[in-house]
Structure formats: structure tokens, C-alpha cells
Amino acid sequence: NKLELLKWIREEKKCEWDVGTINAAVGQGNLEMVKYCVANECPINWSACGCAASGGRLEILKYLREEAKAPWGSWTATRAASNGHLHILEYLVERKFDEYEEDACENAAKNGHLDCLKYLHETAKAPWDYWCVQEAHKNKHTKCVQYLLDNDCPLPDGWRYEHGELHVLVESESESSSESEPESSSDYSLF
């Protein structure tokens, strides 16, 4: 039993612990171990809620927020979106979470989680930026790209969306995207 081992290490061997201890318990999905850490004043910060969100561990996230009063931050939504945990995003909205950053939408788009992307944009009112389109396109998540385009997500410099077609700047190996300017229509590829 991992909880018994943790108790032995702390109580018998008097080993130190830090936020990594509770994060490891959260990552394993071991609620009893998390409760032990909280009851015995293990250091905790915003990363514990992020770890719970990353693994889709709603019961642990609820315990951390509602019982342990653990802090959370934008990383909580970002990790949930990155791994497609819509139920975590729904919980965040229910709890009036308001610390969304562009990374949440970007990670949902990057990993093809259209349901999370839609929920973040339409319900959570999370911000987004051109990275969403760029990452969804790069990873060939066409449904996410189309949703972003249909909802006026900003485009990367040099990209265009006209008459239902996405024109993507093809970057040469010797130029960075911030320096390259299209010289002709051959500098674009169509999505």
C-alpha cells in the first residue's frame, strides 16, 4: 500500500516532503494519499490542481478546492484542455473559474479536442490567439481549424482565409515566420 509507505517514510523516518509529494499522490489518483498529505500539512500550491486536471481526476480536484482550499491558476484549465477533459472544464465553469489564458484554447486545438475548444470559447469565454489556428493546422486537426476559422480566431502573420479557403504561408528553412513575407501565390499552401 503506497499510503502505508508514505506514512512510514514521514512518521518513522521523518523524511522531508514538498509540493512534489502531494503532486505525486494526485498524479497516481490516490485520494487517500492526497487526504493524508493535506491532513499532515504537506506543502501545496497551484500545481496540485493542475495535476488533477491533467489526469481528469475530478474527485481529487474537488477535494483539493473544496476541502483543502488549494489554489489554482490558468494551468488547471490548460492541462484539462490539453488532455481532453471536458468534465474538468465544466467543473471550472461551475465553480466560476476565471483564470483562463490563451494556452487553454491553444492546447485543445493542438491536440484535436474540438469539444473542449468549443466549450472554452462558447461557455467559458476563454481567450484565444493565432497559435490556436497554427497548432491545429500543424497537427492536422481539420475540424478544429474549421471551427476556429468559422469563429474568427486571429490568423498567424501572412496567413489568409478567403472564400472558404485557408492560405498558409509556407516557411523556407532559412527564414523564420516573423521575417518571411510571401512573394507570390506559390508561397502559400491551401488547407
Model-derived segments and spans:
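Ankyrin-repeat boundary/"N-cap" motif
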Residues: 16-24, 43-51, 71-79, 99-107, ...
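Leucine-rich solenoid repeat scaffolds
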Residues: 130-173
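Conserved ankyrin/ankyrin-like repeat signature
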Residues: 4-5, 32-33, 59-60, 87-88, ...
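Acidic, Ser/Thr-interspersed intrinsically disordered low-complexity regions
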Residues: 168-190
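Short intrinsically disordered, low-complexity coil segments enriched in acidic
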Residues: 1-9
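Ankyrin repeat domain, specifically the short helix-to-loop turn at the C-terminus of the second helix
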Residues: 8-15, 35-43, 62-70, 90-98, ...
